[in-house]
Amino acid sequence: MSQEYTEDKEVTLKKLSNGRRLLEAVLIVVTILAAYLMVALVSFNPSDPSWSQTAWHEPIHNLGGSIGAWMADTLFSTFGVLAYAIPPIMVIFCWTAFRQRDASEYLDYFALSLRLIGTLALILTSCGLAALNIDDLYYFASGGVIGSLFSNAMLPWFNGVGATLTLLCIWVVGLTLFTGWSWLVIAEKIGAAVLGSLTFITNRSRREERYDDEDSYHDDDHADGRDITGQEKGVVSNKGVVSNNAVVGAGVAASSALAHGDDDVLFSAPSVTDSIVEHGSVVATGTETTDTKATDTNDEYDPLLSPLRATDYSVQDATSSPIADVAVEPVLNHDAAAIYGTTPVMTNTATPPLYSFELPEESLPIQTHAAPTERPEPKLGAWDMSPTPVSHSPFDFSAIQRPVGQLESRQPGSNQSGSHQIHSAQSSHISVGNTPYMNPGLDAQIDGLSTTSLTNKPVLASGTVAAATAAAAFMPAFTATSDSSSQIKQGIGPELPRPNPVRIPTRRELASFGIKLPSQRMAEQELRERDGDETQNPQMAASSYGTEITSDEDAALQQAILRKAFADQQSERYALSTLAEQSSITERSPAAEMPTTPSQVSDLEDEQALQEAELRQAFAAQQQHRYGATGDTDNAVDNIRSVDTSTAFTFSPIADLVDDSPREPLFTLSPYVDETDVDEPVQLEGKEESLLQDYPEQVPTYQPPVQQAHLGQSAPTQPSHTQSTYGQSTYGQSTYGQSTPAPVSQPVVTSASAISTSVTPTSIASLNTAPVSAAPVAPSPQPPAFSQPTAAMDSLIHPFLMRNDQPLQKPTTPLPTLDLLSSPPAEEEPVDMFALEQTARLVEARLGDYRVKAEVVGISPGPVITRFELDLAPGVKASRISNLSRDLARSLSAIAVRVVEVIPGKPYVGLELPNKHRQTVYLREVLDCAKFRENPSPLAIVLGKDIAGQPVVADLAKMPHLLVAGTTGSGKSVGVNAMILSILYKATPDDVRFIMIDPKMLELSVYEGIPHLLTGVVTDMKDAANALRWCVGEMERRYKLMSALGVRNLAGYNERVAQAEAMGRPIPDPFWKPSDSMDISPPMLVKLPYIVVMVDEFADLMMTVGKKVEELIARLAQKARAAGIHLVLATQRPSVDVITGLIKANIPTRIAFTVSSKIDSRTILDQGGAESLLGMGDMLYMAPNSSIPVRVHGAFVRDQEVHAVVNDWKARGRPQYIDSILSGGEEGEGGGLGLDSDEELDPLFDQAVNFVLEKRRASISGVQRQFRIGYNRAARIIEQMEAQQIVSTPGHNGNREVLAPPPHE
C-alpha cells in the first residue's frame, strides 16, 4: 500500500525563490519570538527588574531572563491583560502569510487602509473594555496605559455601562473593517458550529448515508460536467466555424450562427451584405478575373495593420444578378472597401452594420471595366497625384468632374464612347461635397449623365455599383475651378447656361446689383424633397431641375429688374454720380458681408439702401450748395459695371473672395488735427460706410446737411446749434461743429469707453446721416464744478503739512475719559500650571547638570515672564547661579534668563524666564485700577504691571526726578508717553504744567497745543538751554515766596494761598517793585502749578550745549524738588559722559529698559540685569530709597490713543505760553548763567580778555596758568566772557571759539 502511494506521489524537492526564502525565515523568527514572549508573559514576576522596577537585589524568576522580564513588563504596562493575546495573534499572522504563498493579488490600498483602521479600533476598544470590566493584574491596569486613558476619558461623559456599550459598538465595527466578514455570515457560522456540536453530542448524525449520497452526487456532477463540457466545446468549435465562414461570406456565417441560436439578437442582426441583397443590389457575374486579382493582391497585405481581413476583398459570387447600365465611380465607406467592389463583413457578427445607401434597381448604372484592386491602407505621398478616387466618409457623395479642357473642347452634340468617358473621369479628381447641389444650367443630354450611351456594358461588383449609383444621382458635370484642386466651392449661385463661356458673377456681386438669389439652404431643402423622384428617373430629374430653377431664375431676374429701376430712380432723384456707387460696390468686403439666408440678405440690402439714400441726399445737397445746380446725371444709369463673360468656367472660391480690381486709398481720420490743415474739410470717399462705422460715437446724431468741399479747398462753415450727446454728458455744452476754427490739441476719441460702446443699426444709420463738418473741433471748456482754485494748484501746501486748528467740541467731563484708550481683551489666556510644573522640573534638572542642587518651591506667573523661586541647598552661593545665567538660557532654549539674587522678604533666589505667549499690558487697564484712582497726587504716573500682574503706580512728586535709559526699540518712548498720559488723566493745567524738550522733533511734538504747556515744544537746543535757565530762575523765585510764607514745599504754599483766598484776603507779592510793572498795587499771589520738564533725548542735548546744561540740570536736581519742578530725562546712550556722576547723584529714581551691555546697565542702575531684558516695554524700575530694582512690564500706548487724548485737551482750552522762557531774559538768577545782574566783573577780566584775543584760544586752564589764579576764578572769568559774547559756548569736546576780533583789527 505504501509502495503504491510512493509511486503515485513522487516526493520532489522544489527550490524556493529568494523572496520566499526570506519570507519563511522571517516567519520562523517571528514564531519563535511569539513563543518566547508567551513564556515570558506566563512566567512574569513583579519582583524582577523591568521598566517599572529599577531597584532589584534578588535573582530573576522569569523564564525569559532579564530581557523577557523587561518585555513582559512593557507589554503588561501598555496593553494590560490583552498582552497574553499578542503571541497567539503573531502566530496566526505568520500562518496566514505562509498560506498565501501563491497568491499574487493586486494590492488594494483602500482595503489596506480599512484593515489598518479596523486593527487600531480593535486594539483601543479591547484595552478600554478590559480596563472597565476586568480586575487589575499585579500592579498593572487591566487595560494598560491605553485602556486607562480611554476609560478615564469616557467615564465623565458616560457611566460604566454606557462606556462599555460604546466600546463594544466600536469593537464590532473594527472587527468588520479588519476581517471583512459580515456579521450575518459570522452568525451563520456560529449557528452552524453550535448545531454541529449539538448534533455530534446527541449522536444523531448519519455520516455513512451522507457520504454515500455525496459520492453519488459527485458522480452525477462529473457526468453532467462531461456532457456540459462537450457541449461547450461544440459551441466553441461551431463559433470557430462561424468566424471562419464569416471571412469567406456572410451567408454561411449567418447559417452557422442560426444553427445554435435562432433567437440570439447578436447572430440575427442583418449584415451589410444582407441589406444589399434585400434591396436588389446583388453581386454581378462575370467578374472572376477581377476577383482573382483582388484575392492574390490582398494576400500580401498584413491583416494586423488593418481592421479588414484579406479575404474580405474577395467577391461573393453566390449572390449575383444583372443590374442597370450607368457607369460612375463608387463611394468609399469607413473601411474603404467599397472601392474594390466588396462589402466588408466583420468577424464579430454582433457589431452593428454601417449605414448603406440603397437605390432602386432601375436607377443602377453599369460600368465598362472592373475597378482597380488596391490596398485599404491610407495613401502616402502627394494626395493629388493618386490615380484613384478619394473619399472621406460613407455619408459623402462623390461626383465625377471632368477637367476644364475637356469641357471647353466638347461640343454639345458630340458623343464619345462610354469607356473613354469613364476613363477620363477616373483620371481626374473627385470633388466630394457635403451638400449635393445639382447645377441648374446643365443640359440633360451631356454625356456625363447620359444613360443611353453606356448600355450593354459589363457589370461591376455589387458594392461598387451601389455606391456608384448613389453618387451618380447627384453628380454635376463640370467643375467650377480651372486647376486640379479638389476643394471646390459649389452651390454659391446659379450657373446659367450660355452658348459662350462667360464669367459667372458671385452671389455678392449679384446681390450688390439688387438681384436676390435663393440661398444655399433653400436649395438643399428642395433637393432633399426631390431625392426620391430623382433616384427613380435620373433623366427626368435632370430636366425637372432645369425647369424649376429656370422658373426661379425668371423670378430672380424680374426682381432684379425692379431693383434696377428703383436704383435708377434714386440716382435721378438725388443726382448721385455712379462713380461713387461703383466704388462703394467694389470696396465692400464680400467675406464679411456675405448673406447666408434670404432674411439676412433682405435686411442687409434694406440697410444698405437706406444708407446709400442718405449719402446721396447729403452729397446732392453739397453739390447744389456749391455749384447752384445739380450735376450731370444722364450717364448715372448707364454707367453700371459691365459683367466680364470671358472666363465663365475659370473662377474659383479664392477668386470670389479676392478682388483684384484697383482700389481707391482708404481714408482714415487722424485723431489729431494739424494747424496747417484746420481749414481743409474732409472729403467723403467711396467707403462712407466703413469710415462712419470707424468714427467714434461722439459724432452728433444728426445735423443739417452742409456743403462738402474737396481736400485742398476751403469751405465756408455754418454755425451749428446741435449739441452732441457726449458733450452734454461730460462738459454740459458742446462745441463740436462750431463755426469758429481753432487749432485742436485733443484727440477726437477721448476715452476707450466711447469706442467700445455697442453699435446698433439705428446708431449706424444716424452716424451715416451726420456729415463730417469742415470746422475743426475746439476743446470744450470744463465746468466750474470740476475745476480747482488757482491758488491750490500753484501752492505747495499739503493738507498733511498743515496743523488742524479747527475748533473742536468741548467735552463735558472735567478730565478725559478712558473711552479714548483701547480696551484690553475680554478673555484672558489661562495659565497652564502643568506646563509650568514641567518647566520647574526642567530647571532643576539643568541646574543639576551644573552641579547646583536646588528645588523650585514657588512659581509666580506674569504677563511676560514667570519667576521660579529656588531653594538652594546649604552651602550653595547665589552668585553661582548668577554666573550661569547665559548657560541656563541656552540649555532652557530661552531668550534671556535673569537671576534675582535677593527677593525681599523671602530666603529664595529668583529665576525669571520669559513666557511662550507674551501678553500685552494696556494703559487703560492700569489707569482703571484702584491704586491709581485713589492716589491723590497730581503727579501720579503708571508704569505697567509687575511679574505678578499687579499694576505699578509711582508718584513723580516723591521721586522727585526720573532718569530713563534704553536702546532703540526697547519701549522707552512708549514709556514716556504713558507717563505723560497718566498726568493728563490725573491733573488739570492749574495743577501741572509741562516744558517739553524734544531734540528729535518726533516723540513729544504730538503734544503741541495742549493747555498744560508753559511754552511750545522746544526743538532747538539753544532754546532748551534758555528754558532750563528759566526753570532755575523760577525755582529761586518760588523758594523766596515759600520762605516768605514760611512753608517747606509747594503743597504748603498752595494751601496757604488757598486759605487766604478763602478768608477773602489774598496775599500780595512781597517781592514786587513798582518798577517791575505799570500796576499801582502789587499783584496777589496765586496758586502755583507743578512743573514737569520732559527731555526726550538728553544725550543729544548734552552733546550740543555741553557743560552749561549739566550745571543747570544739577542745580534743578538738587533744589527743585521743594519748588515743585521735576525732571524726566530720557536717553538712548546711558554712558558716563552723558549721565555724569553729578547728575546720577541727584537723580535717585531710574528706569532701565533693555540696554546693550552690562556697562550701560551698571551706569544707569549701578548693577547688572538690564542687558537681559526682553525689550518692548520690559523694564527695571529702581524706586527712590531702594537699591533693588523691580521688574515691570510697561503699558502699551498707541499713537491713535495719544492723538485722541491730545485732541480732547485741545478742545478744552488753548495753552497760555510764557514768552520769557525761550527769550533768555534775565529774570531772577537766570540772566547770566545763574549770576546776579548787578555782579561786578573780575579785576583781571580786561587782562584775561586781551590774553584770549591774542592767543585766540579760550580755556579755563590757560587763564589759570597765565594769571596764577584758582580754577573757580578762571572759570568765572571765562563765563563772563561768554556772557558778553567774547567767546562761544563750549562745544561737544569742551573747546570754545573766540568770537571777538584780534586787538590789532
Curated annotation (Swiss-Prot):
It is a multi-pass membrane protein. One of its GO terms (biological process) is chromosome segregation. Residues 949-1162 form the FtsK domain. Gene3D superfamilies: 3.30.980.40, P-loop containing nucleotide triphosphate hydrolases, Winged helix-like DNA-binding domain superfamily/Winged helix DNA-binding domain. Keywords: ATP-binding, Cell cycle, Cell division, Cell inner membrane, Cell membrane, Chromosome partition, DNA-binding, Membrane, Nucleotide-binding, Transmembrane, Transmembrane helix. GO terms for cellular component: plasma membrane. Residues 188-1305 are cytoplasmic. InterPro entries: FtsK/SpoIIIE/SftA, FtsK_4TM, FtsK_alpha, FtsK_dom, Ftsk_gamma, P-loop_NTPase, WH-like_DNA-bd_sf, WH_DNA-bd_sf. It comes from the Bacteria. Residues 416-431 have a biased composition (Low complexity). ATP binds at residues 969-974. Residues 405-434, 484-503, 518-550, 578-602, 707-745, 1286-1305 are annotated as: Disordered. PROSITE patterns: FTSK. Residues 535-549, 707-743 have a biased composition (Polar residues). It is found in: Cell inner membrane. Residues 523-533 have a biased composition (Basic and acidic residues). GO terms for molecular function: ATP binding; DNA binding; DNA translocase activity. Homohexamer. Forms a ring that surrounds DNA. Essential cell division protein that coordinates cell division and chromosome segregation. The N-terminus is involved in assembly of the cell-division machinery. The C-terminus functions as a DNA motor that moves dsDNA in an ATP-dependent manner towards the dif recombination site, which is located within the replication terminus region. Translocation stops specifically at Xer-dif sites, where FtsK interacts with the Xer recombinase, allowing activation of chromosome unlinking by recombination. FtsK orienting polar sequences (KOPS) guide the direction of DNA translocation. Consists of an N-terminal domain, which is sufficient for the localization to the septal ring and is required for cell division, followed by a linker domain, and a C-terminal domain, which forms the translocation motor involved in chromosome segregation. The C-terminal domain can be further subdivided into alpha, beta and gamma subdomains. The alpha and beta subdomains multimerise to produce a hexameric ring, contain the nucleotide binding motif and form the DNA pump. Belongs to the FtsK/SpoIIIE/SftA family. This is DNA translocase FtsK. The lineage of its organism: Bacteria, Pseudomonadati, Pseudomonadota, Gammaproteobacteria, Enterobacterales.
